[in-house]
Amino acid sequence: MSSSTMDNNEPKVLEMVYDSPILPEGSSMDPNIINCINRHINMCLQHTYSSSIIAILDRFLMMNKDELNNTQCHIIKEFMTYEQMAIDHYGGYVNAILYQIRKRPNQHHTIDLFKKIKRTRYDTFKVDPVEFVKKVIGFVSILNKYKPVYSYVLYENVLYDELKCFIDYVETKYFQN
């Protein structure tokens, strides 16, 4: 059987597997098909967790003080601790940005957040992406308390790979059995 024939039949096989509630006893299924199904299910689950964490993060950044005080979500409670991390890391820069925002409230502000680089024992440099994303979330949370339109700062300063590392961190901490 050629590979093009196999590719054309694969969706049909998957449909048959999903349509049949239970395989008859004694029947066997090609291990490649089982692996394909498992990969597909894992990708769907991972995408669901990732999009849920992004949705929780976006919701957190738009919550007012009363909603934050009354939340029962452990992830949001953790996000709330990131504000102090941002203050400790960025210090006076937070106040300077807030001053600029108050001075020109209708202007789009370009906010570039610096990353703290750590020297490794091999005399190279690295940035811990999870810690950086936590500090940026805290920084954006502080800005949004003044006026909740600054969520773009998060996505302008954080690369996709850094955000993915953060999502993996949250998934590992809160969604692992």
From Swiss-Prot:
Domain of life: Viruses
Chief subcellular location: host cell
The keyword 4Fe-4S is annotated on this UniProt entry: no
GO BP, one annotated term: symbiont-mediated suppression of host cytoplasmic pattern recognition receptor signaling pathway via inhibition of IRF3 activity
Induction: Expressed in the early phase of the viral replicative cycle.
A Pfam family the protein falls into: Poxv_Bcl-2-like
Subcellular localization, as worded in the UniProt entry: Host nucleus
Summary of the function given for this chain in its UniProt record: Plays a role in the inhibition of host innate immune response. Within the host nucleus, inhibits activation of interferon-beta promoter by inhibiting IRF3 activation.
Family as reported in the entry's similarity comment: Belongs to the poxviridae OPG036 family.
Name of the protein this chain belongs to: Protein OPG036
Protein's organism: Variola virus (isolate Human/India/Ind3/1967)
Organism ancestry: Viruses, Varidnaviria, Bamfordvirae, Nucleocytoviricota, Pokkesviricetes
Gene: OPG036
